[in-house]
Every structure is written in C-alpha cells, then in structure tokens.
C-alpha cells in the first residue's frame, strides 16, 4: 500500500515527537527491583534500602519506593540504563522524595553518572555529571542542589533554591535545554529558571577590571567636607565630669585612717562633647570612582555547557542522620511535556489521599493521647483519694488509741 506524501510526513512527525525515555522506575513489580539496583561495596557499613510505601500513603502499591532504613548511615545504591548523550536535545531528570520521618539532617538528591562507573565501588568521591535534589540539615540548610560537573570540577548554582521540608511526597524536576537554559520545578511548578552561564561560574567573567586603569590622585570621593570658615567657640571646652558641688565630707571621716577626702564626681551639665566643624557640600566632589572594565581575554563562550557525552547510571549517594526517606517515580527523558504528565499521573494522583491518611492518623493519635491523659489523670485522682482514705483511717485509729489510753487509768483505779 502506498502512502501519500502528506500522510507519510505526518507519521514521521509523530514518530519524531515521541519522547525518549532513558530511565523510568516506579517499583511496581515487588522485589524485582533488587535485580536492577546495585548496592555499592565500597564500604561495609552502607545503609540498607527497603521497598516501602511508608507509614502513610495515597496508594499502598503505587507509592512504594526505596526507603532508607538505618539511622546515621551513608547510602550508596544505583541503577544503570542504556548510555545516551544529551547533545542537541533537552534533558529532564525527575523523581519524588518523601521525608516522612520529619528529617533533621540528610540528603534527598540523585546523581547522574557517566558510563564507566563501577557501581559496586560507587562512593561520595565518584565523578558524576549532575547532582540534583533536596538537601536538609538543620534550620540553616534547606536547599535544592543543582550541581554540574564541568571540565572535571563540580560547580554549584549561585542561587538559593528552597526545598520542601514537610513530611509529604514532593516531585522534583530539573530541565536542561540545548540553548544553555535550565528550569527547576517542585510539584510541577517552576521555582527557578535562567541561563547556565549566568547562574553558575562555569566560565571566566566576560568583563574584568582594566589592570592599566587607576583612580586619579586628585579624584575626590568626599561628598561632604568640613567648613573651613567654621571655628570652635572659645567656651566650648569643658570637662566631662566635675566634683559634685553638693557633696560634703562625712563628719566621721578620719583623714589619718581614710585618707584625704575627695568629693564624688558628676556629669558636667556644661559639657558639650567633642567639637566638630559643620559639614558643607564638597565643591571638588566627583562621585565614586568606578574602575573601568575591559573584555576578559580569558573568556571564551561555550555553547555546549549543557551537554555531556554520556549518561548511564542514576545513583543515590547520600548521608542521613534520621532514616525514613522514600524515593520513587524516577524518570529521565528528553520531553518536558511527558515528564509533567508523568508527574501528574503518579505524584499528582496520590498526593491528596496521602494527606488525608496522614491527617486521619494525626487525629487518631491526638484522640489517643487525650484518652491516655484522661486515664492518667483519673488514675492519679484515684490514687490521691486512696491516699486520703488511708490517711483518714490512720487518723481514726490514732484517735481510738488515744481514747483507750485516756480510759485506761480510770479502769485501773476501779479495779483497786
């Protein structure tokens, strides 16, 4: 069957528009994930990941992901995929993170490694291409890392991107485009964007201060100067403190014993402080001298800052003080629209139910604590009442004993 040219071009266009999905992981096949993910053996005490949907979730199966399970541990786990280069195309890295343990210090980011990585020896110093995701440590560090390896050096973003720090699942997305622009999204909403060259120090500055330029010696940057016609008044200088004129030597003051008496000093009401001449506009003022700039001879533009020869491994290489973080819904693609749709179909579908379950658990916990407090108070009141009753019984017995002792002498007299 022969196809018309317009139809053929249309089909080719549809084929070209299909997203390239380089890596996708949702952990929907039980323990089979252990066949795809490799634990590093670089250290013997790396923390263990387990498959879990956590203490609360929107869907028991869909929300299962890799959860850190041991406190105060480094973690090193990775999964490989068919190597690819992002040259000439958009790169989208996306995943969900849930810090249900109310994390105080720990990473929630991923690293993308080039081909050639020894997964069983992956560790903190293994060279990576991109590091992206949230990092929390105390109140001072709650940021989204976006780090690129450029010519062997890890370069951090110059902006501060705030991450989510609650207990719910959040969707993190990094988009790197072939025009050297980028975008960071959280929960499918843009939180930062811009130019790679502007927001990272990949390249030397375009302009530098002219090394041959210098501020002229007669350049006056003083906006105000002392009035040369102003002079200090003759009666200006007065001591700051003077002897108290109202003070009197005590009558019992013995100069042989106490020494010569000196009156206490007080603040001088006539003291005016340091004299300063009044200020006037400087007639020679030229403003702040600005060092002229020239083109930096060491600057050379790079149209391929965004590009890497190969991506082949996604790794979780991080430290956590308090475990419990769940990673899920990993996606690496070249299609921004597909990534947004995938996020809406995963995180977007279960987020409301997750919050409802957490709210229900919190309410149940609140009621349980109220009931426990009520029961504890009732027990304390019962114990107090029992103590009061015992005290009353003791007092009654003591009274009876005293009455018996009072009656005993009379009985003895009658017997006599």
Curated annotation (Swiss-Prot):
Residues 193-277, 350-416 are annotated as: Disordered. Residues 191-255 are annotated as: 4 X approximate repeats. The modification N6-acetyllysine is found at residues 48, 159, 209. Residues 252-261, 380-408 have a biased composition (Acidic residues). GO terms for cellular component: acrosomal vesicle; cortical granule; cytolytic granule; cytosol; endoplasmic reticulum; endoplasmic reticulum lumen; endoplasmic reticulum quality control compartment; external side of plasma membrane. GO terms for molecular function: calcium ion binding; carbohydrate binding; complement component C1q complex binding; hormone binding; integrin binding; iron ion binding; molecular sequestering activity; mRNA binding. The keyword Secreted applies. A motif (Prevents secretion from ER) lies at residues 413-416. Residues 259-297 are annotated as: 3 X approximate repeats. Ca(2+) binds at residues 26, 62, 64, 328. Pfam families: Calreticulin (PF00262). Residues 309-416 are annotated as: C-domain. Residues 198-308 are annotated as: P-domain. Disulfide bonds join 105-137. Belongs to the calreticulin family. Calcium-binding chaperone that promotes folding, oligomeric assembly and quality control in the endoplasmic reticulum (ER) via the calreticulin/calnexin cycle. This lectin interacts transiently with almost all of the monoglucosylated glycoproteins that are synthesized in the ER. Interacts with the DNA-binding domain of NR3C1 and mediates its nuclear export. Involved in maternal gene expression regulation. May participate in oocyte maturation via the regulation of calcium homeostasis. Can be divided into a N-terminal globular domain, a proline-rich P-domain forming an elongated arm-like structure and a C-terminal acidic domain. The P-domain binds one molecule of calcium with high affinity, whereas the acidic C-domain binds multiple calcium ions with low affinity. This is Calreticulin. The gene is Calr.
């Amino acid at each position: 069957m022969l196809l018309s040219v317009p139809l053929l071009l249309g089909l080719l266009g549809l084929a070209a528009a299909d997203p390239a999905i380089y890596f996708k992981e949702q952990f929907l096949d039980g323990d089979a994930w252990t066949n795809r993910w490799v634990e590093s053996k670089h250290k013997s005490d790396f923390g263990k990941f387990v498959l879990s949907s956590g203490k609360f979730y929107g869907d028991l199966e869909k929300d299962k992901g890799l959860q850190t399970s041991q406190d105060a541990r480094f973690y090193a786990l990775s999964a490989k995929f068919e190597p690819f280069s992002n040259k000439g195309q958009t790169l989208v890295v996306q995943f969900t993170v849930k810090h249900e343990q109310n994390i105080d210090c720990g990473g929630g980011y991923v690293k993308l490694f080039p081909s050639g990585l020894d997964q069983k020896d992956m560790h903190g110093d293994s060279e990576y291409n991109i590091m992206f995701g949230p990092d929390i440590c105390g109140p001072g560090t709650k940021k989204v890392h976006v780090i690129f390896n450029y010519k062997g050096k890890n370069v951090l973003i110059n902006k501060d991107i705030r991450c989510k720090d609650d207990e719910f699942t959040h969707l993190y997305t990094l988009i790197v485009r072939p025009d050297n622009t980028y975008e960071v999204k959280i929960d499918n909403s843009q939180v930062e964007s811009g130019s790679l060259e502007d927001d990272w120090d990949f390249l030397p500055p375009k302009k530098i201060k002219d090394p041959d330029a210098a501020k002229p010696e007669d350049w006056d940057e003083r906006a105000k100067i002392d009035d040369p016609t102003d002079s200090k008044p003759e009666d200006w200088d007065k001591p700051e403190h003077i002897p108290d004129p109202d003070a009197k030597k005590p009558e019992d003051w013995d100069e042989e014993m106490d020494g010569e008496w000196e009156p206490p000093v007080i603040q001088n009401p006539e003291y005016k402080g340091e004299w300063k001449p009044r200020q006037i506009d400087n007639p020679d003022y030229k403003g702040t001298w600005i060092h002229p700039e020239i083109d930096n001879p060491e600057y050379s533009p790079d149209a391929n800052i965004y590009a890497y020869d190969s991506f082949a491994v996604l790794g979780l290489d991080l430290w956590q003080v308090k475990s419990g973080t769940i990673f899920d819904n990993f996606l690496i693609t070249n299609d921004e629209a597909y990534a947004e749709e995938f996020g809406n179909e995963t995180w977007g579908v279960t987020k409301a139910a997750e919050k409802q379950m957490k709210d229900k658990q919190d309410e149940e916990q609140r009621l349980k604590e109220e009931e426990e407090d009520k029961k504890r108070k009732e027990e304390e009141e019962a114990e107090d009442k029992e103590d009061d009753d015992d005290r009353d019984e003791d007092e009654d017995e003591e009274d009876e004993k005293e009455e018996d002792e009072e009656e005993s002498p009379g009985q003895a007299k009658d017997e006599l």
